[in-house]
Amino acid sequence: MAPEPHHAIVAYPGGLRGRWSWGGSGQGAAVFALSESGGSLTDHGPLAGPDVESYCRAELRIEGPGGTWAARFASPIFDEPRGVLWDSAGILVATYGFTTYGFDPRSGDLRWHHRSATPIVALLGSSRLEHVIVQAEIETFAIEADGTVGWRVAHSDVVTEADLLGGRVVLTSFSGQVTSLDPTTGRASY
């Protein structure tokens, strides 16, 4: 018997309320069974690959001053979705599996998407940065407001954790190595 889908309620700045639902491989019907009606609904699953019905699935529903919208996602691996409102750029950034998505937070229109070669570990945003930082298992990259990659850093070990601390991107690898990057340039700082 498959486990029940997971659910999370989140609040984003600007009066946005989000509800995430996600589940394992082939659980799309269970994840979407409790979808609420009203507002627009767009399935971005095909951006993850060809056979999305066998993939893990997720749904994000946003309610806010600009209206209600929902987006569906797919991933070939089980993942917990994450999101951050990049208020200075006016973009709701979400990640699921290998893909990062940039949405208009009021309408839900997809402005851009970026697919990583490895699963995404963390999504970091700050109003002090001109980009969001996406941490995948073996690369760190900065995505600009228009969806272009501002900089990219490859790693020789799998990154298991990432955070913005003291004005630095601090990465912990599978072997326990800690690396610090300048969040504006991606250059290593010691």
Predicted regions and their residues:
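A short beta-strand motif characteristic of beta-propeller blades
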Residues: 66-76, 109-115, 147-154, 190
